[in-house]
Structures are given as C-alpha cells and as structure tokens.
A protein has these predicted regions:
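Conserved Radical SAM active-site core
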Residues: 91, 104-130, 140-197
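Short pre-active-site segment immediately N-terminal to redox-active cysteine/selenocysteine motifs
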Residues: 134-138
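Flexible, acidic/Gly-rich N-terminal and inter-domain linker regions that tether
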Residues: 1-121
Length: 197
C-alpha cells in the first residue's frame, strides 16, 4: 500500500486544505484531526444517514465517544461501508446500547482486582497500571469502553501515585504493564515521570 495514496491525499485535503504528505505521516496530525462526529464521517466518506439513523448514532456516541483517525477512515470502502470490517471496528452502532442479561460493564473484572484506583492486580507478580483513558481511535469492541474517552476519569499524577505506592509496597510485583487507553498518547514528560517513579 502506498504511504500516501490518492484517497488519503483527497481525505487530507478535505480535513485541512493545506495538508501535505508530511502531515499524513505525522501521528500527532492524525490525533488532532480525529473525526469525532457522525456528520464528519458522512462528509469525509461521502455517505449519508437518515436523520433517524443519525440521531440514534448520536445517542450511542453520547455514552461511548467516537474517534477515528484519518488513516483508519482512509481504509474504509465507502461503496460498501456497512459491510466494511474497519468501519464496523471504528464506527458506532446502536447495538452498543442494547444490554443483554449476560453483558457486563466490566467484562474483565478489573474493578474487582483493583486494590487502589487505576491499578489491576490479578496475578501475583504483575500489575496493570491504567495511565490513560484516551486512544487515537476508539474501537467499538473495547472492553474498557465504559472508561475510555471519559474526560472525568483522566488519571492525574495524584491518582497514579496511589498505584505507584502500591507497587513499591508490594515486593512480589516484578512486571508493571502501562495500559489505558493508549499510554503512548501521553506526553514524553509524563511517560518519563511514570517510568522514573
């Protein structure tokens, strides 16, 4: 696949008229220009939902936010988008709001294995430290979708210090997995602080 195909160039120009190939290859440009609205997807893919569909999809994104990077959007086939696997992974579905008897808000039981907020300690020698709740793209199948994108639960340094102290005081822990969201969306300074602590 080309690094900057004709379709990608076209999308980049719709997003930002002055977009260049160097923008397209810059991950920060993609994060800044993530598509977060139903109307944005319609405009960029040249598709159209009915007003009823649009409203139902908005109801879904109110509970589970949407973010699709321009790159992922460029992989979607607008001619057959409803059957496109990338579209289904990235685009909200009204089925996400349907709760079945067997559905759980915490399917991995991370909260049960959480001795302090933001840390999961399920196995004796390793912990999972939740350092971010943001991703470049919000996958619709995410097992943490109840937290991802929630601006009210972005971990602060004080929140993270509780987890760090727990790790320091638990000598059997030898592996610490940084998780989220995507930890690599944190600033270099924040990652440096986490790894130093």
């Amino acid at each position: 696949m080309l690094i900057y195909s004709e379709n990608q160039r076209r999308l980049a120009k719709i997003i930002a008229e002055d977009a260049t190939r160097s923008n397209w290859t810059d991950w920060k440009w993609h994060v800044r220009n993530s598509i977060k609205s139903i109307e944005g997807v319609e405009r960029l893919l040249g598709i159209e939902f009915t007003e009823k569909e649009r409203q139902a999809l908005r109801n879904t994104t109110e509970k589970f936010p949407m973010a699709i990077t321009p790159y992922y959007l460029s992989l979607i086939d607008p001619g057959d988008y409803r059957n496109d696997p990338v579209f289904m992974q990235a685009f909200p579905s009204t089925d996400e709001l349907r709760i079945e008897n067997h559905d759980m808000s915490d399917p991995l039981h991370e909260d049960e294995d959480s001795p302090v907020p933001g840390l999961t300690h399920r196995y004796p020698d390793r912990v999972l430290l939740h350092v971010s709740n943001t991703c470049a793209m919000y996958c619709r199948h995410c097992t943490r979708k109840r937290k991802v994108g929630d601006r009210d639960s972005i971990p602060s340094r004080d929140d993270l210090r509780q987890g760090i102290e727990y790790i320091r005081n638990t000598p059997q822990v030898r592996d610490v997995l940084l998780s989220g969201g995507d930890p690599f969306l944190l600033s270099d300074e924040m990652l440096d602080w986490l790894l130093t602590e």
